[in-house]
């Protein structure tokens, strides 16, 4: 009998030892607590991964990627945001990435971070998502991303570089994707001009910058909800308008003609502007940096609670017969304001007479 017990113990040991590394990590993740995952796949930037698996895990769970602010950590965002508690209510998994840099801001400045599969922080975070989908049989139609401050910047970048992964995003006091771009390709660089609201452009330019981060992609893009405060002196309020311009440009909405504007929504002194089903902007009067997380509104936007669908739609394609919108002349020559170059650009590279192809950044050149 004793020999049989020893044999059984040895059998169990060998069975556990033969489990794949990924399976072993899942076994070690304790439901209801923040846990680190170290072997989620390729991690080119050395970003840390923490995960919260709720005790009330859905059979086919959704995923929320929650990205911290400068000076923050995964632990700080876990304790300071409502997503873990909401995960218990709705059964989704929360991924908390942690910046590898001193000061723990996110790299939203280097070309690697601003390019699909470019090898930066965005690449590492995307690999966390695909690992979690695989290990937990997650619902790929219910994957979302959110963040505050620097994490909000990265949220915009994730939506631009990996649109195929996310159904929707909420952005709390960030800047548009590419606004912090470093012309010297510096990793984790600060851009004072952008932060102070001095980088101003058109929806067409901003939208082109976002699209160029994943050249050739034509699939659905995440619905975007943008929050910003009117008294923000870290990332000035102009960044709200530029971010809304960017996503209006991506989705083909007329930025200057929103569908509706709602005062005191979702609360007093907040104004919600709706351009279409894929874009809402929420401007908080009297609020600084950052706008507090509105967890229940996030759940509605993500479709876990009543109020919003998680369905994404193809970007709207608009056309014009004039050159004022920056469209191609159709003869291989770009009109005034039209795109004429940038990473991944396959359209005309020559401007109409009287205009010069001017480099805005690595992803976008424009006829000016």
From Swiss-Prot:
Gene3D superfamilies to which the protein is assigned, alphabetical: alpha/beta hydrolase
Its gene is axeA
| Spans annotated as Disordered | 306-330
Query: Which PANTHER family does the annotation name?
Result: FERULOYL ESTERASE B, UNNAMED PRODUCT-RELATED
This protein is called Probable acetylxylan esterase A
State which residues form the propeptide.
20-28
Q: Which residues are glycosylated?
A: 191
What reaction is this protein's catalytic activity? Answer: Deacetylation of xylans and xylo-oligosaccharides
The CBM1 domain covers 332-368
